[in-house]
A protein has these predicted regions:
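Sec-dependent N-terminal signal peptides
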Residues: 5-14
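C-terminal edge beta-strand
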Residues: 106, 129-145
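Surface-exposed binding patches on compact interaction domains or structured appendages
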Residues: 52-107
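A short beta-strand micro-motif common to beta-rich folds, especially ectodomain repeats
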Residues: 115-129
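Positively charged n-region of N-terminal signal peptides that target proteins for export
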Residues: 1-4, 18, 123
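Bacterial Sec-dependent N-terminal signal peptides
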Residues: 13-41
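A structural signal for beta-rich interaction modules in eukaryotic proteins
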Residues: 46, 118, 132-134
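Short beta-strand segments of immunoglobulin-like
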Residues: 33-35, 40-55, 97
Length: 145
């Protein structure tokens, strides 16, 4: 009886030891390469005429766009979800921007504004258990940055 109990204990012990690992969730933060510089207020500044912004993830081969939000200064925030196309890379189209992921490349196209107030946009991305976000501030026609 003692031999059976010892044998059972030795068979079960590896399951307890292997399930107590710290490796789950230890994802490196996403690292990006781009020619666009983020300002000290943590925004990518966009002129009223809009523009295209390209970001290259250097440490993950792919990721997907999770959500996008947009807001006018002192206005209500609107949230948008991605359009999935047969499990291909996701894209999001809002009233003011389009964000698309292709492999390790994120392309954000911001439309021109016709509003006097500044517009604020955020694009959120995910690769497994690691998340990142891109904040854009588009200057209004009658407001400086």
């Amino acid at each position: 009886m003692k031999k059976n109990l010892l044998l059972l204990f030795l068979m079960v012990l590896p399951f307890f030891v292997s399930s107590c690992s710290d490796e789950d969730g230890d994802w490196d933060p996403m690292k990006w390469k781009t020619e666009v510089k983020k300002s000290s207020d943590d925004y990518f500044h966009v002129p009223p005429q809009g523009g295209n912004y390209v970001f290259y993830c250097t440490n993950y081969s792919s990721f997907w766009v999770v959500s996008a939000t947009e807001k006018i200064a002192r206005g209500e925030e609107k949230r948008f979800s991605p359009n999935y196309d047969d499990n291909k890379d996701a894209s999001i189209t809002t009233d003011w921007l389009t964000a698309k992921s292709e492999g390790n490349i994120l392309t954000v196209t911001i439309q021109p504004t016709t509003q006097d107030a500044n517009r604020f946009m955020k694009v959120e991305v995910e690769a497994g258990d690691v998340f990142d976000e891109f904040n854009f501030k588009q200057r209004g026609l009658k407001v400086g940055l």
